[in-house]
Each structure stands twice: as structure tokens, then as C-alpha cells.
A protein has these predicted regions:
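Short gly/ser-rich loop at a beta-strand->alpha-helix junction or flexible surface loop bordering the NTP-binding
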Residues: 37-122
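A conserved hydrophobic position in a structured secondary element of the catalytic/binding core
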Residues: 21, 92, 139
Length: 180
């Protein structure tokens, strides 16, 4: 793995440790590959507002083994609120989908929904979830990758998270760390 990252200039290797660099390029490349895999997305409608849906999902998740996690724009709003969004985006573990839909009284729709449930194609999106303001959300890395695959304002929201969570070090900072 380290040689893969080094070959693409995505790590700065010193004699005792290595650090990620060119993080923006790394995420854009990663997102391109990641979005070739298909996760199932289901659309629903709720009479509740998006913030109410997100709050209900967070409360539900606490009593269901963290089986529902905010992702996409819903997670981005917790990390770096920069864009408005109209839909609650929630990862729900496959074994919990039916119960989640029933408990939150969601109605399936083909278009015009205000809730998007993503059933992940692997465990990665939920594996590194973290609490932000008492709500479980996808990791900053997963959130960025999801947003980069989203048309519209996704890239803008992803860039805000990249700036906040993964600030690039300047060349001067790198030289100082190396002692040059």
C-alpha cells in the first residue's frame, strides 16, 4: 500500500514516518474508482422536514446497533455547512432497511423524495462513522468520496470538508518538518 501511494506522490516519506500529501488529488482519484461500484439507493418521502428526519434517524440508530448513519450532504452539513440541501441522505445497513422505513414512516417514491437511503455495497461507509454533535455520520473521507460522486453542489461541499479536515501543508511546512 505504501509503495502504491509513494508512486503516485500521495505520501511524503521521511526516514521514520510518512504523511499523506496531494490529498485533493488522492480523493478525486479514489472517488472516481469508488463510484464505479454500485450501492443501492432508494428514494422515500416523509412529511417531516429534513432536519426532523435526520434527528429521527440518529435517535433510531442509537437503539439499533448504529444501523443508520447520515451520509452525503447530511454528513457534510455537520462537518462544514456550506451548501443547502433538500434530502436527508442516510446509509442503512441491509438487515435494518425494512424496519427503518417502517419506524420512520417513510413512503417509497420514484421521484421527488426527501429521503435517500443508501444500502452500502460493503461495510466501509459505516465502519468509520463518527459522532458529530451527537449524530452518527460517515467519516470525513467517506463523506468527501460520496459528495464527489454527486452531481450539482457535491464538489463544492467536498472541497469545504477537504479544506477543513485535510488541510494541505505548504512546501515551507514540509521543509521545516524535514529539517531543511
Amino acid at each position: 500500500m505504501k509503495s502504491f501511494l509513494l508512486a503516485r506522490d500521495w505520501i511524503d516519506k521521511s526516514t521514520t514516518e510518512f504523511r499523506l500529501q496531494n490529498i485533493r488529488e488522492l480523493f478525486y482519484t479514489w472517488a472516481k474508482d469508488y463510484h464505479q461500484k454500485e450501492a443501492r439507493k432508494l428514494q422515500f418521502y416523509s412529511l417531516d422536514t429534513v432536519p426532523e428526519i435526520e434527528q429521527s434517524a440518529a435517535e433510531w440508530s442509537k437503539t439499533h446497533d448504529n444501523g443508520a448513519i447520515l451520509g452525503g450532504f447530511s454528513a457534510a452539513a455537520r462537518y462544514a455547512p456550506t451548501v443547502r440541501y433538500q434530502k436527508a441522505e442516510i446509509y442503512v445497513e441491509p438487515q435494518f432497511v425494512q424496519e427503518f422505513v417502517k419506524d420512520l414512516e417513510l413512503q417509497p417514491v420514484n421521484t421527488g423524495g426527501n429521503v435517500v437511503i443508501t444500502i452500502p455495497h460493503d461495510e466501509t461507509p459505516c465502519m468509520y462513522a463518527k459522532p458529530v454533535h451527537d449524530t452518527l455520520v460517515t467519516s470525513p473521507a467517506q463523506t468527501v468520496i460520496d459528495l464527489l460522486g454527486d452531481a450539482g453542489r457535491g464538489e463544492e461541499a467536498a472541497e469545504a470538508i477537504l479544506r477543513r479536515e485535510y488541510p494541505e501543508r505548504t512546501e515551507d511546512e514540509r521543509r521545516t518538518e524535514k529539517g531543511n
